[in-house]
Structures are given as C-alpha cells and as structure tokens.
Amino acid sequence: MTGTTENDNTGEDEKPKDEECAAIEHKDKFNPTAYLNSFYKTASEDTAMQIVLFFLPGILYRLPQKVRSVLDLGAGPTVYLPISLRDRAENIYTSDYAPANRDTLINWIEDKSDFDWDNVCSWIANIEASMETGKQMQNKTRKLMRAVLDVNVHESPVVQSIVWKENEQVQVPDKFQVVSTVFCLEYSCETLEAYFRAVRSACSLIDEGGILIQGGVLDATTYNFGGKTFRCHRLKQAHIIESLKANGMATTAEQGYKFITHDDIFLLVSKKL
C-alpha cells in the first residue's frame, strides 16, 4: 500500500467524521480511485508527492545505468516509480496487498485506466528535462511491465501469488536487483515490531549487492482520504537505521547509503552488503 498525509483544517463541525481503519484493513477498505484523485490528480496537489518526485531522480542516479529487475513493492494503485525507471529498468514487476489496487495496476498496464497520469508524467519530465510526452513515457513503461504480484510484507512468502503476467513465458524471480517501496512499509502496520518485520520482508527480496529504494513519512500516525483515516506506525529515523542494519543493508555513505528528507518526507537508497 502507498499513502501520503492529507490534512483538513476546515474545522466545520458538520463535516462527517472519517471512518477510522486499522492498517490491516487496507486490503478491503482501500479505494484506489479516491486515493488517486486525492493525491495524484496533479502532482502539485500534494506536498509529499512533490517532494518525492523532486528528489527521486537524485536517488535513481545512484542505480546502475541498466537494472535487470525491479520490484515496486506495495505500489498501491500508482505507477510513478516504474515511469521514473523506464530508461534504466529492463524488467519491472509491480505489486500490492489490496485486490482493488492490483486491478488498477493491471488496467493501467493494459491501457484501460480511468485515471489520467499525464499531469504526473509532465512533472517527472520537467524534473528530468525530458521532451517525452506523458503518453510516450507511459507506453515505454508499459512495455517493461512483466507481472503484477499479490504481496504481504507480514507473511512468508512475501509474494503470495502472481495475478497478472505479460505472457506465459514470464518467470518471476525470487529476488530482484532493485526493490522500491514508497509510502508502504510504515503504512502497512501500527507497531515497531511489525515495521521491523515489513523491512525484513522487503530486504529478503533483494539480490546480494542489490539496492533498496525506500520512501515515506516520519512521525505520522494516520493518513486520510475519501472519508477514511488509516492508522500507521509512527516512524522515526532511528527505526529506519536500526532495521536496515539488522537486515544487512548499508547505513553509511561509504557502504552505499543516501538519505534525503524534507518536511518529514524521506527517500533513501541502501545497498545490500
């Protein structure tokens, strides 16, 4: 699952109170259409999205020029990470815990999406100084999509099943050269123990010498959209460092670690040692 924080400061007493949901309820209560319209209709509508898209090229610059395999772990209904990786990745796999999100991803891959990603593509292209149109960027990315996976970072195996494949010849690897997971791990749970489990699951999918790209929000306890408030783990930077160390991941620049943060939104890249 992915998510950012949406605040409402109207103070109107008559406004209906959001339904409060546990993190585990993402599976059945997450509305991909409401989520995309709240946070991704235009990249400029959400500060967290602006920050992620602005800093993402600097993170991706640290990847090899060509990446054999990428897994977008807990993508929700979003495709901005595959689009951003379209010139480096050779094979992209995407995934989520919620069936509705997986259906949304499949619809986008098959060019049947109801959501218009052109505004986000324009934002990415401006940062990249690319002359490609949104349609060109998306079509190039679609050709790289190999499978959509059902995943659960709190169970073993993490990859529960393959729900869509480009063709019958596609073999989903056990591990990937790059695993990206943005607005996912801390939103998948509500306790520190569960967060550590989620990080362990993510790192277990990375090849030796491979790379983790992680992004999220520090110090958030909930996020809300579409009349629902989802609880999440209140993440601290110390939790990030401790969990990476525990799973054999780089935590210093010399090892292959970079951490960028602005307004409690963070992105990091960490090499598997």
Swiss-Prot record:
Residues that, per the record, bind S-adenosyl-L-methionine: 35, 40, 74-75, 80, 96, 101, 152-153
Top-level taxonomic group: Eukaryota
Family: Belongs to the class I-like SAM-binding methyltransferase superfamily. NNMT/PNMT/TEMT family.
InterPro entries: NNMT_TEMT_trans (IPR000940), SAM-dependent_MTases_sf (IPR029063)
Disruption of the gene: reported phenotype: Suppressed lifespan extension when exposed to nicotinic acid and nicotinamide. Reduced reactive oxygen species levels when exposed to nicotinic acid.
Enzymatic reactions: nicotinamide + S-adenosyl-L-methionine = 1-methylnicotinamide + S-adenosyl-L-homocysteine
Biological process annotations from GO: methylation
Name this protein carries in UniProt: Nicotinamide N-methyltransferase
Organism whose genome encodes this protein: Caenorhabditis elegans
Keywords attached to this entry: Methyltransferase, S-adenosyl-L-methionine, Transferase
Catalytic activity, EC: 2.1.1.1
Broad EC category: transferase
SUPFAM superfamilies in alphabetical order: S-adenosyl-L-methionine-dependent methyltransferases
